[in-house]
């Protein structure tokens, strides 16, 4: 590291800004307790305490020795900031809260996050210069270009006018720094998303203690299609970092063994070109690419790569260095004036006057009372905790356990069919862990129309074409007696469900000793179009099915597949003590021992060709149109509008009389999955047969939030040898790794909105999981939920699942709405439970047959990136429809065969 260069660059920026000292006024503020409120939909409270000025022996850089006054200052202790206050500008990106988490750790307090069009310049000026609320500014990545005013918002004016405030721009923010000073923003040699490069730098303070150059260990993740043309840089902008080679790098931990490489050369027919892979990385056109700039006389820096990515090395060090730049900048300004200004500075920097800001933020925030922590058996003690309009419900849960008895009564399939399968299994549910290998899932939950607390919710978004309606939607509620009431939810379904869950009171002792997290509550689905309640302005298409359907279930049977145990649960009003329903369930289970397990109807075992599949199912899009849409996605990516777009389509087939439960039983055998599900909503003439391998989001009783996105899929091989080769091909695929990483960073962002600072982590990155028909690439992201965030806050922060949208999420969903010619409906949404104690577990609705009004539909698609081959994407989409479509056709074939024999 060139320390001289580091010192000189810091001095050059700071000293040139000393002339602006009169612009920025400082006043003496007495230390006092304060409350920091950050913006994460729910307000985040900072601990009340007096801010202290710590004294350290740190000396300002040696270039100050030339001045007698400054030399004297060198020998005096200087203040060290306990925390740094950052204004984080969000350019509608899906990685902003990864930056938020890093800054929260490094700065000692959370930054305030605002969208780039949320505050006027007058408001920004007020907080920056009149209230002196912030010490520095970070400008996030985002879709689009800095040349488009709607993409960049207020950021250009910040960069142009805030000459005396440290600013760090990331990706789009970096490009904006170049553009505002006259540099040209052009297309990169190639779009570069979710891939790694080695970086070399000039040793300036931003890269302090970070190695430089090829094989130095400084690997970074890049997400960009546009770059600053280095030839157009004005003299006031200094290049400080570049890609060190024209090569992409493999991810750490992903290695190609010699045996695999040798085998691939011998099996060219299997690998379809995989033999071309080698240890040498693919060359990038155009050579080195500019990766960082700084202003010669302002404390402004830009980074083209993403320091916040989970796969970037030294990312946290970069943010630490920016904090240090901020501290040194203000300390240097202080040292150029009178001693009394130093005292004023110390007080000013340490005690922000945040009251006006807090009031402004509070107007926008969604404040959630800390209701989740209430745990009492006394109803009277909790009446004041409910939301207005939602009466308090004190729930009592009782349960019994039948040890090692599931197999004795025919297993999960027989239990469900015998207890809930009569009368077409109407109004029944089965969250079915039909694939339990490698502990992917352990419990199955099932039930039907239950006791007095049972009800069914059905919600449809309002028709935005109705000019009298500005959002919300229509809810119908059927109770246990069949009575239906309807109401309009002005604030939408998520708000209603949130208030419902927060209105429950209970005693934790009721479920002590149970090894699972669902004890009764809501079970059902949330459709993809409810994205309209999660930040998307509107839906272009309207779903034929309800946008959400859930049961409130008060009687549940749980099967522990690991130990073969059965649990019966009954939920009732706390004012009663009835256990008759629980005893009835237990007796019905015991009676099953005398029954012969119900056999699945005989199914045809032959395979189906693509021609036969097409003859049964009609596609919403032709092969030609789907490939054209893939190319359109790649054009959007090239223009910087998205990093990755998850394009989907639907297959449909009209059905005659069909036993939907029998179809599901066939599907679960043909394609067992850990997050499978059966749902029937008879009032809606709707059945859902789901064989999903993917978890969307889970919140357990210990407040641990987990997502398990799948990105990367390949067919299983016909022989063990071929199967292993295909598995390794997926593991080493640069395209699939890039897809997966983009979604991992997106989910880290979503969890970061509602999780405790520093708790979001990735315990498993890009692992391969194998299922009946495919291998998949899966990652796991976890975090600790904040105490002031509710279960619905967590879902709303991450819905729809990023693996079904792409990134940045909001812009990607808008683009996909224009490319896709129908609503996704239930597909791409989620199925699962919301327990009355706020725990939940939700899947991603894929590999699913939706049967509605006599029509079967199957959705499928894939993530489109710059590396995608349009023809391969079409084939991958067909591959994902294979299992559910085959289940439908086999079931139809068995019906025809049975009719012919009569």
UniProtKB/Swiss-Prot annotation:
Tissue: Expressed in leaves.
Active site: 171, 306, 308
Swiss-Prot/TrEMBL GO biological process terms: 4-aminobenzoate biosynthetic process; chorismate metabolic process; folic acid biosynthetic process; tetrahydrofolate biosynthetic process
Gene Ontology CC: one annotated term: chloroplast
Keyword terms, alphabetized: Chloroplast, Folate biosynthesis, Glutamine amidotransferase, Multifunctional enzyme, Plastid, Transferase, Transit peptide
Catalytic activity: chorismate + L-glutamine = 4-amino-4-deoxychorismate + L-glutamate
Protein EC: 2.6.1.85
Coiled coil: none
Places the protein is found: Plastid, Chloroplast
Record: transit peptide: 1-47
Source domain of life: Eukaryota
Pathway info: Cofactor biosynthesis; tetrahydrofolate biosynthesis; 4-aminobenzoate from chorismate: step 1/2; Antibiotic biosynthesis; candicidin biosynthesis
UniProt-listed InterPro entries: ADC_synth_comp_1, ADC_synthase, Anth_synth_I-like, Anth_synth_I_N, Chorismate_C, Class_I_gatase-like, GATASE, TrpG/PapA_dom
Domain notes: The PABA component provides the glutamine amidotransferase activity. The PABB component catalyzes the formation of ADC by binding chorismate and ammonia.
Role this protein plays: Bifunctional enzyme that catalyzes the biosynthesis of 4-amino-4-deoxychorismate (ADC) from chorismate and glutamine. In the first step, a glutamine amidotransferase generates ammonia that is channelled between the binding sites of glutamine and chorismate and used along with chorismate in the second step, catalyzed by aminodeoxychorismate synthase, to produce ADC. Required for the synthesis of 4-aminobenzoate (PABA), an important component in tetrahydrofolate biosynthesis. Does not possess ADC lyase activity.
Protein name per UniProt: Aminodeoxychorismate synthase, chloroplastic
Protein's organism: Solanum lycopersicum
């Amino acid at each position: 590291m060139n320390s001289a260069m580091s010192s000189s660059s810091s001095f050059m920026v700071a000293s040139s800004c000393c002339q602006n000292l009169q612009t920025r006024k400082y006043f003496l503020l007495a230390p006092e307790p304060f409350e920091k409120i950050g913006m994460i939909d729910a307000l985040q409270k900072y601990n009340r305490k007096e801010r202290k000025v710590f004294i350290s022996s740190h000396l300002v850089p040696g270039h100050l020795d030339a001045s007698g006054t400054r030399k004297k200052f060198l020998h005096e202790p200087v203040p060290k900031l306990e925390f740094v206050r950052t204004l984080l500008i969000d350019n509608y990106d899906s990685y902003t809260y990864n930056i938020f988490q890093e800054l929260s750790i490094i700065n000692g307090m959370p930054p305030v996050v605002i969208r780039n069009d949320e505050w006027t310049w007058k408001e920004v000026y007020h907080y920056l210069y009149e209230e002196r609320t912030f010490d520095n500014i970070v400008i996030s990545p985002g879709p689009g270009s800095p040349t488009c005013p709607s993409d960049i918002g207020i950021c250009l004016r910040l960069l142009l006018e805030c000459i005396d405030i440290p600013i760090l721009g990331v990706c789009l923010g970096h490009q904006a720094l170049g553009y505002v000073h006259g540099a040209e923003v052009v297309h990169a040699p190639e779009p570069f998303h979710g891939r790694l490069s080695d970086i070399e730098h000039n040793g300036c303070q931003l890269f302090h203690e970070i190695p430089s150059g090829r094989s130095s260990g400084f690997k970074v993740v890049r997400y960009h299609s546009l770059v600053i043309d280095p030839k157009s840089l004005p003299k006031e902008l200094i290049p400080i970092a570049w890609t060190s080679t024209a090569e992409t790098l493999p991810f750490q931990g992903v290695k190609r063994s010699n045996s695999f490489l040798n085998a691939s050369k011998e099996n060219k027919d299997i690998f379809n070109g995989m033999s071309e892979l080698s240890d040498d990385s693919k060359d990038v056109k155009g050579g080195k690419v500019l990766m960082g700039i700084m202003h010669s006389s302002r404390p402004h820096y830009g980074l083209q790569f993403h320091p916040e990515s989970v796969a970037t090395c030294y990312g946290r060090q970069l943010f630490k260095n920016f904090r240090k730049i901020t501290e040194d900048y203000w300390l240097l300004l202080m040292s150029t004036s009178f001693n009394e200004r130093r005292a004023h500075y110390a007080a000013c920097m340490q005690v922000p006057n945040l009251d006006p800001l807090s009031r402004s933020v509070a107007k926008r925030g969604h404040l959630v009372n800390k209701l989740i922590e209430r745990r009492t058996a006394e109803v009277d003690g909790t009446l004041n905790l409910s939301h207005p309009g939602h009466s308090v419900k004190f729930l009592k849960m009782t349960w019994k356990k039948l040890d090692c008895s599931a197999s004795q009564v025919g297993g999960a399939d027989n239990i469900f069919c015998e207890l809930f399968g009569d009368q077409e299994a109407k109004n029944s549910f089965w969250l079915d862990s039909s694939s339990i290998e490698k502990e992917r899932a352990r419990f199955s939950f099932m039930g039907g129309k239950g006791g007095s607390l049972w009800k069914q919710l059905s919600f449809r978004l309002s028709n935005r074409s109705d000019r009298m309606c500005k959002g919300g939607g229509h809810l119908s509620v059927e109770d246990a007696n069949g009575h239906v009431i309807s109401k309009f939810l002005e604030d939408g379904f998520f708000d209603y469900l949130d208030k419902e869950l927060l209105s429950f009171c209970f005693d934790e002792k009721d479920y002590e000793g149970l090894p699972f997290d669902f004890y009764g509550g809501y079970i059902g689905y949330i459709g993809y179009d409810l994205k309209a309640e999660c930040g998307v302005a509107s839906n272009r298409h309207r779903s034929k099915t309800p946008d959400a359907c859930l049961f409130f279930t008060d009687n549940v049977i749980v099967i522990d597949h690991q130990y073969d145990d059965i649990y019966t649960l009954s939920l009732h009003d706390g004012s009663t003590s009835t256990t008759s329903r629980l005893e009835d369930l237990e007796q019905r289970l015991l009676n099953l021992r005398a029954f012969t397990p119900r056999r699945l109807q005989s199914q045809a075992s032959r395979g189906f060709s693509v021609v036969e599949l097409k003859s049964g199912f009609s596609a919403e899009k032709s092969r030609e149109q789907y490939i054209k849409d893939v190319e359109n996605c790649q054009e959007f990516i090239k223009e910087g509008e998205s990093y990755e777009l998850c394009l989907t389509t639907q297959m449909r087939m009209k059905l005659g009389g069909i036993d939907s439960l029998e179809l599901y039983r066939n599907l679960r055998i043909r394609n067992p999955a850990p997050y499978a599900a059966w749902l029937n909503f008879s009032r809606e003439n709707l059945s859902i047969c789901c064989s999903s391998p993917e978890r969307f989001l889970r919140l357990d009783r210990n407040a641990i939030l987990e997502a398990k996105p799948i990105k990367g899929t390949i067919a299983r091989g016909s022989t063990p040898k071929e199967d292993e080769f295909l598995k390794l091909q997926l593991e080493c695929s640069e395209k699939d790794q890039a897809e997966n990483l983009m979604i991992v960073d997106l989910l880290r962002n979503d969890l970061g909105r509602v999780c405790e600072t520093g708790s979001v982590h990735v315990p498993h990155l890009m692992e391969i999981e194998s299922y009946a028909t495919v291998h998949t690439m899966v990652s796991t992201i976890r975090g600790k939920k904040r105490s002031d965030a509710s279960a619905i806050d967590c879902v709303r922060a991450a819905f729809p699942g990023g693996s079904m949208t792409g990134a940045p999420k909001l812009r990607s969903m808008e683009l996909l709405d224009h490319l896709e010619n129908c609503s996704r409906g239930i597909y791409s949404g989620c199925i699962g439970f919301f327990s009355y104690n706020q725990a939940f577990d939700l899947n991603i609705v894929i590999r699913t047959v939706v049967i509605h009004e006599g029509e079967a539909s199957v959705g499928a698609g894939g993530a489109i990136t710059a590396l995608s081959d349009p023809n391969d994407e079409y084939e991958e989409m067909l591959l994902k429809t294979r299992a559910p479509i085959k289940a439908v056709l086999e079931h139809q074939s068995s019906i025809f065969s049975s009719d012919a024999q009569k």
